[in-house]
């Protein structure tokens, strides 16, 4: 893709629990080194280049499906769980957060338009069931 080929991922919640101050410090160190940095539900990700989820979504819909994402936004739904999803929450009219997004709400400038009852994979499955049930 036109996106990043590699990044640095620092665990903050998968196998260890870093306090928010250490997460913030890690992000600051990455940014001071000229990297982009975001925080997911389990990792701090840092990378060089101007790549982001929205540009990646535009690229993949164009290259794989010959579809202009921005011209067809009403046909798409985006689901996320962390601060690194807020650009997509802002851009996508059908944006969903899984329940564990709640811990990141104080840090989000842009919230999902809907939040599932289930966390993580259960929240994704909840959304999938709702979409399938709504099909004609």
Where in the sequence are the language-model features?
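Conserved acidic, metal-coordinating active-site core of Asp-based
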Residues: 1-77, 82-91
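Glycine-rich phosphate-binding/hydrolytic loop that grips phosphoryl groups
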Residues: 113-135
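Acidic, Mg2+-coordinating phosphoryl-transfer loop and its flanking beta/alpha structural elements
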Residues: 57, 75-118
């Amino acid at each position: 893709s036109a996106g990043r080929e590699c990044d640095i991922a620092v665990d903050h919640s998968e196998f260890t629990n870093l306090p928010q101050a250490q997460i913030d410090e890690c992000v600051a160190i990455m940014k001071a080194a000229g990297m982009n940095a975001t925080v997911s539900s389990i990792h701090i990700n840092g990378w060089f280049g101007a790549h982001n989820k929205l540009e990646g979504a535009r690229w993949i819909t164009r290259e794989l499906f010959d579809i202009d994402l921005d011209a067809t936004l009403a046909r798409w739904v985006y689901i996320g769980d962390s601060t690194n999803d807020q650009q997509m929450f802002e851009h996508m009219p059908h944006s969903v957060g899984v329940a564990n997004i709640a811990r990141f709400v104080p840090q989000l400038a842009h919230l999902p338009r809907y939040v599932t009852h289930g966390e993580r994979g259960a929240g994704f499955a909840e959304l999938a069931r709702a979409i399938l049930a709504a099909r004609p």
